Amino acid sequence: IGMVVECKDGYLVGNDGCKYSCSTRPGHYCASECSRVKGKDGYCYAWLACYCYNMPNWAPIWNSATNRCRGRK
């Protein structure tokens, strides 16, 4: 029996709509944060923000079209 599981990749965002910053965090920070929302793996992209792989569809990711970080669009 086959099962289709939808996953997505992207920048992890917090409740404020902002990307998770990683510039001053330890190397494993992003991988830990991504796995916390059931992502497969993650890394600190250009030492600025956490990028996650294979996250479930319910996990919030940053989108430039709907960016609401600190009330901005």
UniProtKB/Swiss-Prot annotation:
One of its GO terms (biological process) is defense response. Residues 8-70 form the LCN-type CS-alpha/beta domain. Residues 1-7 form the signal peptide. Coiled coil: none annotated. GO terms for molecular function: sodium channel inhibitor activity; toxin activity. PROSITE patterns: LCN_CSAB. It holds the Pfam family Toxin_3. Expressed by the venom gland. It is found in: Secreted. Disulfide bonds join 18-69, 22-44, 30-50, 34-52. Keywords: Amidation, Disulfide bond, Ion channel impairing toxin, Neurotoxin, Secreted, Signal, Toxin, Voltage-gated sodium channel impairing toxin. GO terms for cellular component: extracellular region. The modification Arginine amide is found at residue 70. Has the structural arrangement of an alpha-helix connected to antiparallel beta-sheets by disulfide bonds (CS-alpha/beta). Negative results: does not affect the cardiac Nav1.5/SCN5A, the peripheral nerve channel Nav1.7/SCN9A, and the voltage-dependent potassium channel Kv1.5/KCNA5. Belongs to the long (4 C-C) scorpion toxin superfamily. Sodium channel inhibitor family. Beta subfamily. Beta toxins bind voltage-independently at site-4 of sodium channels (Nav) and shift the voltage of activation toward more negative potentials thereby affecting sodium channel activation and promoting spontaneous and repetitive firing. This is Toxin Td5. The lineage of its organism: Eukaryota, Metazoa, Ecdysozoa, Arthropoda, Chelicerata.
